[in-house]
């Protein structure tokens, strides 16, 4: 069931989202060859806690870290490690959920580690374009199918597909709320 939040609650969700975005922006600037994914995790936790937030992934269903750090072909939910050292040319997806004043913010970025190859840059560009194509369809009168169709249609010409096992979702008091938003769908 979809929760309908009051304007005041939406502002609190937005504040959690802003802290999430600020944390990801800081991490994007911090990513460099030679650092471990564990170091990124430590930076994220300190940044969030210093601003009154709580790293919501840490301890969630036993997850041991603040961020999910997925390097190269790790699809999602990579666990930060002192042994996972970033190399020039890698790409890393950093997924993060922040709780602030009882409300959640959730976002992910994918960035190159130093300079990377054209194939990786194309993947980053195509997935970012797909995100914005989906957002463009998130308007009154459209369906979740319109959003998913836009995402999948955007990446197909690049030779990419979507993972049907993983979906977007609502956010609010809970980390994963309805509706589920697949990256595929039928418009209308």
Where are these regions (language model features)?
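Active-site neighborhoods and metal-handling regions in enzymes and metal-associated proteins
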Residues: 1-188
């Amino acid at each position: 069931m979809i929760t309908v939040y009051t304007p005041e609650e939406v502002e609190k969700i937005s504040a959690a989202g802003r802290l999430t975005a600020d944390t990801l922006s800081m991490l994007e600037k911090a990513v460099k060859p030679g650092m471990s994914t564990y170091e990124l995790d430590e930076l994220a936790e300190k940044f969030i806690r210093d601003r009154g937030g709580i790293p919501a992934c840490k301890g969630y269903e036993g997850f041991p870290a603040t961020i999910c750090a997925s390097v190269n072909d790790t699809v999602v939910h990579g666990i930060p490690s002192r042994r996972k050292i970033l190399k020039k040319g890698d790409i890393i997806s950093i997924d993060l959920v922040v709780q602030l004043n009882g409300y959640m913010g959730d976002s992910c970025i994918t960035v190159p580690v130093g300079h990377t190859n054209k194939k990786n840059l194309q993947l980053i560009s195509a997935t970012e374009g797909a995100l914005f194509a989906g957002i463009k369809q998130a308007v009154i009168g459209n369906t979740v199918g319109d959003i998913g169709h836009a995402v999948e249609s955007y990446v197909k010409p690049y030779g990419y597909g979507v993972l049907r096992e993983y979906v977007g979702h609502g956010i609010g008091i809970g980390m994963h709320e309805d509706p589920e938003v697949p990256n595929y769908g039928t418009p209308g």
